[in-house]
């Protein structure tokens, strides 16, 4: 049933990207100076979850690495590495400069200086979920390092810029902005075809059943891949050689729940507290949410941070 399980994971970088030609071409043109040894402009990729932002950023950088010998690259998920120290540590790790870094005692200024004084090889930094950075002044510091090119990824452009101070806003105002719309249902089917071709045995699922998966996904590529993965696993575990419509309908809620749980599992304690309050109350106004939040923590964040 499953010939390559990696292909069924959301983190898998495909060999080609479907139905994102305009976005791929735009970002490729932004990054083109790197092929000449020059710094590229910063880029912001924004749009809802599951529309291919992360996939395309990584896909294009991997292609660049095949063309440019002297190119360093690091991907950072700022939801997981949200503190200034964590982000800088990951960036230093990307160029092999963490050998004598001590998590408890090394000042972050030392990390930043080490990035500045590293060799001048072009360094592409993808900061995913960048709005989750606790200290966004780090973006200003990275912007000022000549050999670093930043690709920022966020869900909402306005929310991101509203959270930046004036100094940083002025620096990033001219960054190249690329908007990603949700996939249409018929655009998700070629994505599924590729995953089936690369990761499953032949003839285990029909085109009509791929259409059913796409119809259940709400324009989210993560969901179609999740449903396909759960369907293939369940078919294998039950000894079936086909993925049926009944099986797809059965696993769809579980696949969607898994994606939601992955998000919840990455919450910081403050985000988890906010999530629990919203879950308890259902609909709740921003002010009531903040008031309830403040009563449950001894160290509340500002209203702006809570809103973000």
UniProtKB/Swiss-Prot annotation:
Null mutant phenotype: Not essential for normal growth.
UniProt xrefs under InterPro entries: AAA+_ATPase, AAA_22, Cdc6_lid, ORC1/CDC6, Orc1/Cdc6_arc, P-loop_NTPase
Record has ATP-binding as a keyword: yes
UniProt superkingdom: Archaea
Binding-site list for ATP: 51-55, 183, 195
GO molecular function, one term: ATP binding
Zinc-finger listed as a keyword: no
Pfam families the UniProt entry points to: AAA_22, Cdc6_lid
Disulfide bonds: none
Keywords, alphabetical: ATP-binding, DNA replication, Nucleotide-binding, Plasmid
UniProt record similarity statement: Belongs to the CDC6/cdc18 family.
Role this protein plays: Involved in regulation of DNA replication.
NCBIfam families according to UniProt: orc1/cdc6 family replication initiation protein
Protein name listed in UniProt: ORC1-type DNA replication protein 1
Name of the coding gene: orc1
């Amino acid at each position: 049933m499953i010939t390559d399980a990696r292909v069924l994971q959301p983190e898998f970088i495909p060999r080609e990207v479907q139905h994102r030609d305009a976005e791929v071409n735009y970002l490729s043109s932004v990054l083109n100076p790197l092929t000449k040894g020059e710094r590229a402009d910063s880029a912001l990729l924004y749009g809802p979850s599951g529309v291919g932002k992360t996939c395309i950023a990584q896909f294009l950088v991997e292609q660049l690495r095949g063309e440019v010998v002297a190119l360093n690259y690091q991907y950072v998920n700022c939801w997981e590495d949200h503190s200034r120290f964590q982000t800088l540590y990951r960036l230093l790790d990307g160029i092999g400069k963490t050998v004598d870094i001590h998590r408890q005692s090394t000042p972050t200024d030392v990390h930043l200086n080490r990035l500045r004084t590293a060799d001048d090889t072009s360094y592409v930094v993808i900061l995913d979920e960048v709005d989750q950075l606790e200290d966004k002044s780090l973006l200003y510091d990275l912007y000022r390092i000549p050999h670093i090119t930043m690709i920022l990824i966020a869900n909402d452009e306005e929310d991101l810029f509203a959270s930046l101070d004036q100094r940083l806003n002025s620096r990033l105002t001219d960054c190249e902005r690329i908007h990603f719309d949700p996939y249409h249902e018929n655009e998700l089917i070629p994505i599924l075809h590729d995953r089936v071709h690369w990761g499953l045995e032949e003839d285990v699922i029909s085109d009509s059943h791929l259409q059913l998966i796409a119809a259940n996904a709400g324009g989210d590529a993560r969901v179609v891949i999740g449903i396909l993965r759960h369907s293939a696993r369940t078919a294998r575990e039950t000894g079936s050689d086909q993925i049926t419509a009944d099986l797809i309908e059965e696993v769809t809620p579980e696949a969607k729940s898994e994606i939601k749980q992955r998000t919840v599992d990455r919450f910081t304690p403050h985000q988890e507290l906010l999530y629990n309050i919203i879950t308890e109350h259902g609909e709740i106004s921003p002010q009531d949410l903040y008031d309830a939040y403040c009563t449950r923590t001894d160290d509340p964040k500002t209203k702006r941070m809570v809103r973000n």
